[in-house]
């Protein structure tokens, strides 16, 4: 077994450290140079409910760039409560009915957020899950299991 000298160890470890500084970060992390996920690895979100609590949920879910809203469903896009998300995500398609959103954009949606009044969680979440979508839903899912 070869006895490693301190000088040789320092040379090799310095060379390795220098090599890693030249390696582009997106090769090591799998992210693009801007720190965003490439489109093939990004989760496309369909968002049911855009105002109120959704003003905090949607940005939180998409904050790290791994998820991007592609469709919004809300019953009233003229309400002030939806303005924050409409300004934050300007090109997102809008639907007044979540069923229409899932029917028309189902192939483009990977996951669904359901952030609506409690009594409306179940229909939206169950339809999305029946289509094989991953779902983030606020509790409770329903008021009763009967």
Could you describe each region identified by the protein language model?
Residues 1-134:
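N-terminal glycine-/serine-/threonine-rich beta1-alpha1-beta2 phosphate-ribose binding loop
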Residues 138:
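The substrate-binding groove and active-site-proximal loops of carbohydrate-active enzymes
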Residues 141-146:
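Rossmann-fold NAD(P)-binding glycine/threonine-rich loop
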